Curated annotation (Swiss-Prot):
The gene is eIF3-S6-2. It comes from Drosophila willistoni (Fruit fly). The keyword Translocase does not apply. Belongs to the eIF-3 subunit E family. Component of the eukaryotic translation initiation factor 3 (eIF-3) complex, which is involved in protein synthesis of a specialized repertoire of mRNAs and, together with other initiation factors, stimulates binding of mRNA and methionyl-tRNAi to the 40S ribosome. The eIF-3 complex specifically targets and initiates translation of a subset of mRNAs involved in cell proliferation. Pfam families: eIF3_N, PCI. One of its GO terms (molecular function) is translation initiation factor activity. This is Eukaryotic translation initiation factor 3 subunit E-2. Keywords: Cytoplasm, Initiation factor, Protein biosynthesis. The keyword Electron transport does not apply. Signal peptide: none annotated.
Length: 434
């Protein structure tokens, strides 16, 4: 189903190393020609210092089993450069126990003073640590790279020319080592920096667009990610604007998060509005499923789209792990919406709408009732499901109000900030005439 594959688009906004898991995932699918895909991986990995990965890819392409002379020479150069960089950092290598102990690095000023006093630390050592961290990352040694990147974050001033690069590098390395808790902390730190930095409008938009794509990797792997992706993508106007302007395809991941997050059903109304606004620029089976169900009340269309959704999710690296949960919650959405219209439903009709056999549908409904997620009764003799009322809980009402107020507050804050910048710019421009 290459028609709905977003890998090519997503890779444009990811670091080269972050694309490898996506490309390797596609190798296990039958969407693209395997030979061409492996050739692209080889072309990409050749731009890094991961010589072993390069050789492995060559073998998969049935190229030479022996390492070419060019790669032998390049590997020697990589090892030599790595040793040189490690020698440059040698004066602070004695402090490796401090590097690995994050607790002792909380206070930046105290830490720098201790380094200068005990290890004769100089600021040129900081640049050496930055170069080594970057080189280790290029070699695929992400774990060791994170130690030096963290060191740079503690010692480096936020106005340093390399500070933003360190933030991005640290986030990428934590993602690639699957350290999701730390990755979320780095994501938050980077977002705060971007939102407070004095970027031009275009630069800020570009930075947020990249961050949106990287954050999807974190959100769908962190326990709190399903709430956080909704808050960031739907209720932070600056990021929602970036999605609508630069990357409407991200609606797929926002929609998926809302579907599988039963505690955030209040977000559906706002999500549907955005989906309708962007339907002329981006559509896929997941967004169309929600349109069929909540805009057109087309249950047959929703049933068919749900079947397509399964294929789309199965072939999407970001959300493949959510497949079973998505199908279960999507069926529940169909069921709940159908029940709002029909108070009494036959099990056979319901089974047809849910793509299930009648006995499977009955067991499914029984489990919903048993788990206190559904106020209904089953008449087994007549084969009917009789619905009770489904009031919105006070908690859900409160969350809905808070989200609405939060979104309005952020929108007003953004408006005030833009007007302030415009006023300052006009003031600066007026000096040009004197």
């Amino acid at each position: 189903m290459a028609q709905f594959d977003l890998t090519r688009i997503n890779c444009q906004y990811l670091d080269r190393h972050l694309t490898f898991p996506l490309l390797e995932f596609l190798c296990g699918k039958e969407i693209y020609n395997q030979q061409e895909l492996l050739e692209y991986i080889l072309e990409t990995v050749n731009k890094t210092n991961m010589i072993d990965y390069t050789m492995d890819t060559r073998k998969r392409l049935n190229l030479s089993q022996e390492m070419p002379e060019e790669l032998v020479q390049r590997k020697a150069e990589v090892l030599a450069t790595l040793k040189q960089l490690q020698n440059e950092v040698a004066p602070i290598m004695k402090a490796t126990d401090i590097l690995k102990n994050g607790e002792s690095m909380k206070d930046s000023k105290t830490f720098v003073n201790a380094l200068q006093k005990d290890y004769n630390f100089k600021m040129e050592h900081l640049y050496s640590a930055y170069k080594l961290a970057k080189y280790l990352y290029e070699c695929g040694n992400y774990q060791e790279s994170t130690s030096y990147l963290y060191f740079c974050l503690i010692v480096m001033a936020p106005n340093d020319k390399n500070y933003l690069n360190v933030l991005w590098g640290k986030l990428a390395a934590e993602i690639l080592t699957l350290n999701w808790n730390t990755a979320l902390e780095d994501l938050t730190r980077l977002r705060d920096y971007i939102d407070s930095a004095n970027f031009s409008t275009i630069q800020a938009l570009q930075q947020r667009t990249w961050l949106i794509h990287w954050s999807v990797l974190v959100f769908f792997n962190h326990p709190k990610g399903r709430d956080l992706i909704i808050e960031m993508f739907l209720y932070k106007p600056l990021y929602l604007n970036a999605i609508q302007t630069m990357c409407p395809h991200i609606m797929r991941y926002l929609a998926t998060a809302v579907v599988i997050n039963r505690t955030r059903r209040n977000a559906l109304k706002d999500l549907i509005k955005v989906i309708q606004q962007e339907s002329y620029t981006y559509r896929d089976p997941i967004t169309e499923f929600l349109e069929c169900l909540y805009v057109n009340f087309d249950f047959e269309g929703a049933r068919l789209k749900l079947h397509e959704c399964q294929t789309v999710i199965l072939n999407d690296f970001f959300i493949v792990a959510c497949l079973n949960e998505f199908v279960e919650d999507a069926r529940l959405m169909i069921f709940e919406t159908f029940c709002r219209i029909h108070q009494c439903i036959t099990i056979s009709m319901l089974a047809d709408k849910l793509n299930m056999k009648p006995n499977e549908a009955e067991c499914w409904i029984v489990n919903l009732i048993r788990n206190a997620r559904l106020n209904a009764k089953i008449d087994s003799k007549l084969g009917h499901v009789v619905m009770g009322t489904q009031p919105l809980s006070p908690y859900q009402q409160l969350v809905e109000k808070i989200d609405s107020l939060s979104m309005r507050s952020e929108h007003l804050a953004g408006l005030i900030e833009r007007k302030s910048k415009q006023k300052n710019q006009e003031s600066i421009d007026s000096w040009k005439y004197y």
